Each structure stands twice: as structure tokens, then as C-alpha cells.
């Protein structure tokens, strides 16, 4: 096996690893509301979502073309002589996306897997080729503008949809309303899962296509091979089946308490927007769309409580995702190319960066087990969450300190001076 082939295998496996993290990181986008309302049991929900992600990955390749040909300026690299350089750009870009995905999953923050990937690729391309290494027109038109507009549009559509749903269903009894909308929610959540597979699996297809172009296996105007589509579909389905319970909990319980009519409105709005954007090749963040839709259900239902503090932390995560992943991509590219130059090889840097990725991922997974979220506690009341328990512990500690201070002040003066000493 040649060195070039070994590097290609490492890059493809890393791309599929990103696709896997995309699956478990973004499961909540499709199934959080269905799980929160009880329309589907947690494990049933992720199994259904995984199946539909698998199917959705085969429906279109327009987003894959955007990623494969619309971010990195291939004209800046002579593939025939510098294919290894492009391979390193793709590889370290993937590392940036994976590390940011796993980190935000650890904190239960539904940040954008798409923007983590794009940020990693942009950062590594900038480090390797400077400003001219990125196709900025494609970045702005296909990524930045949709990123700003999609959550706003989703929130508006979901707000109107929620208001209409409650208005139309107002004469119906609560029991019939709940049962009927639960079945409706299964349908809209399934459509959302299909949309997620259609949109997100394609992004990894585009990255693998870039790696194949770099290796000289295909030309940049060739069609995406079937094995690439199939492997990406399977990887995202497996990741989805594991269920990103931390993020499912944040989306389903953290922003707003969702009832079944709200779930139907949110999932329906998200699916419609994502499927439409996929048709036009826009690499939307399903996280931004789903979060905007869930927020809209809180605005559209009279008396619903929106937890703006949670929403604010999520927006901060959205804003820093692109630059943070870019920084990781650039740093890992510098490490990789520095080691390759030092050893006069084209693989030592990739191997070391891969080991760094593996070590950090294992550490973050082990750390997550200290406060595990799974199918058994994903729907627990948000008021019983770790944050409230932490605040209670802090309050008890402060009260204990106040009690100690009060005891000291009640001592006679000499004893008080001794206690203060």
C-alpha cells in the first residue's frame, strides 16, 4: 500500500468520523420535540430518525457540490504535483469540525455541525494558501447569509404555524388534541429526519470528494461515486442511532416546554425550510433551523415561557463556532505541515494530528460519563437539571459561610479576635 493511499484512507475515515459525530450531535434537531412531548419513546425516536437519515442521504447531491467545489479554491493548487497539500487541508479541516462538535456536545450546546465543518476547512485553507485559498463568494452566498436568515425565517414560520394550529384546534378536547397531534408529530419529525439526511450527509460527501480530487482518483467535474454516498449515509445513520442525548435534552426541554401541537408546528416548519434549501444547494445548518422553529413555538403559544438565558447561550455558541473551528483547523494544519517538513514525509503530520484528535475525543467522552444523559433521564424536568442542583449547592455553601460569620460576631471580643486570627 502506497503512502498516498494510506493518507487517503486516513482522510476518508476521518470524514466518516465527522459524519458520525454529525449524526449524534444533530439527532435532537429532528427528534427533540417528539421525545419531549412523549409522542415517541426516546430509543424508538432515534431508531426512526436513523433510518430516515439513511434514506435522505441518497435524495440529492446539490449540497455536496457546494462543499466539494464551493469553499476551497482548487485553482490555487496544482493537483498533479501538490495533491498531498490539498489532502492535508481537507484532513485538518475535518479535525477542526470533529473537535468542536464533540466539545459542544459535551456541554449540551446545539451548535452547528455544518459550520464546524466549514470553519475547519476555511481555517486550514487560510493557513495553507492565505486569503485567496477560500472562495469567499461561495462562503457568503451559500453559508453566511443562510446562517443569519435561516433561524429568523424558521422562528417566524413556526410562530405563525403554532398560532394557527392552536386556533384551528381550539374547539377540540384536550385528550383528542393530544392524541391526534402526537400522530401528526411522528409524521413531521420523520420528515425532518429525512431532511436532515438529505442536507447533512451530503456535506461529508463533498469533503470526501475533495480528498478524492486531491489524490487524483477523480476529477473535480466528475460525479460523486456511489460508494461515497452509501458510506456517508451509513455513518450519519449510525451516529443518529446512538442519540446525542445531551443536545436532545437542551432542545426538547431547555428552550421552551413543548406540547404536541407546538411540536408539529416546529418540525413541519424545519422540514419545509431544509428540504427547500437543499434543492437549491444551500448548506443550511439544521441546528439553526430547528432551534429557530422551537423558539417560534414558544412565541406563538399564548402563555408559553421562553428561557431566553438558554437561547442566548446557544446564540453565542453559534457565533463562535465558525471562528473557533477555523482556529482549530489552522492550528492542526500548522502542526501537520510542520511535522511533515521536519521529517521530510507526507504522513507523519497526519498521523500525529490523528492521534491528537483521538486523545481529545476519548478524554471528552470519559469526562461526559461523570454527568451522563441518556434515554432514561433525557425528558426529566429542566428545573431538576444539573445547573439548578449546582446553584442550590452554591446557595447552601454561602448560607453556611454566613452562619459561621454570624457565630463569630456573637463571640465575646477577645474570642472574636482569636477566631479572626
Name each region found by the language model.
Residues 1-421:
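Multi-pass alpha-helical transmembrane bundle typical of ion/small-solute transporters
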Amino acid at each position: 500500500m502506497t503512502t498516498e493511499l494510506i493518507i487517503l484512507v486516513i482522510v476518508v475515515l476521518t470524514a466518516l468520523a465527522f459524519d458520525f459525530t454529525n449524526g449524534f450531535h444533530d439527532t435532537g434537531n429532528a427528534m427533540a420535540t417528539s421525545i419531549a412531548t412523549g409522542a415517541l419513546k426516546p430509543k424508538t425516536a432515534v431508531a426512526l430518525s436513523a433510518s430516515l437519515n439513511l434514506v435522505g442521504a441518497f435524495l440529492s447531491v446539490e449540497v455536496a457540490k457546494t462543499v466539494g467545489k464551493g469553499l476551497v479554491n482548487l485553482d490555487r493548487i496544482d493537483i498533479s504535483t501538490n495533491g498531498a497539500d490539498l489532502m492535508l487541508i481537507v484532513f485538518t479541516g475535518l479535525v477542526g469540525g470533529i473537535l468542536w462538535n464533540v466539545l459542544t456536545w459535551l456541554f449540551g450546546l446545539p451548535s452547528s455541525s455544518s459550520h464546524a465543518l466549514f470553519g475547519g476547512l476555511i481555517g486550514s485553507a487560510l493557513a495553507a494558501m492565505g486569503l485567496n485559498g477560500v472562495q469567499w463568494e461561495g462562503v457568503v452566498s451559500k453559508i453566511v447569509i443562510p446562517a443569519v436568515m435561516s433561524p429568523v425565517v424558521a422562528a417566524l414560520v413556526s410562530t405563525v404555524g403554532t398560532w394557527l394550529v392552536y386556533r384551528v384546534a381550539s374547539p377540540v378536547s384536550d385528550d383528542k388534541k393530544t392524541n391526534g397531534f402526537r400522530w401528526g408529530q411522528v409524521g413531521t419529525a420523520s420528515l425532518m429526519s429525512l431532511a436532515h439526511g438529505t442536507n447533512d450527509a451530503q456535506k461529508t460527501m463533498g469533503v470526501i470528494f475533495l480528498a478524492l480530487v486531491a489524490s487524483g482518483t477523480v476529477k473535480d467535474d466528475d460525479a460523486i461515486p456511489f460508494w461515497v454516498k452509501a458510506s456517508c449515509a451509513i455513518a450519519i445513520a449510525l451516529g443518529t442511532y446512538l442519540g446525542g442525548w445531551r443536545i436532545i435534552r437542551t432542545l426538547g426541554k431547555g428552550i421552551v416546554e413543548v406540547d404536541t401541537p407546538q411540536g408539529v408546528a416546529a418540525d413541519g416548519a424545519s422540514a419545509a425550510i431544509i428540504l427547500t434549501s437543499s434543492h437549491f444547494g444551500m448548506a443550511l445548518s439544521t441546528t439553526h433551523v430547528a432551534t429557530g422553529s422551537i423558539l417560534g413555538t414558544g412565541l406563538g403559544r399564548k402563555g408559553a415561557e421562553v428561557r431566553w438565558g438558554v437561547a442566548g447561550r446557544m446564540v453565542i455558541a453559534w457565533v463562535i463556532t465558525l471562528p473557533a473551528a477555523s482556529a482549530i483547523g489552522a492550528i492542526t494544519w500548522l502542526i501537520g505541515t510542520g511535522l511533515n517538513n521536519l521529517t521530510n514525509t507526507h504522513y507523519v503530520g497526519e498521523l500525529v494530528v490523528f492521534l491528537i484528535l483521538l486523545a481529545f475525543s476519548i478524554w471528552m467522552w470519559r469526562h461526559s460519563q461523570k454527568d451522563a444523559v441518556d434515554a432514561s433521564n433525557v425528558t426529566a424536568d429542566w428545573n431538576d437539571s444539573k445547573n439548578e442542583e449546582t446553584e442550590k449547592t452554591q446557595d447552601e455553601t454561602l448560607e453556611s459561610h454566613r452562619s459561621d460569620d454570624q457565630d463569630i460576631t456573637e463571640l465575646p471580643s477577645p474570642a472574636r479576635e482569636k477566631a479572626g486570627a
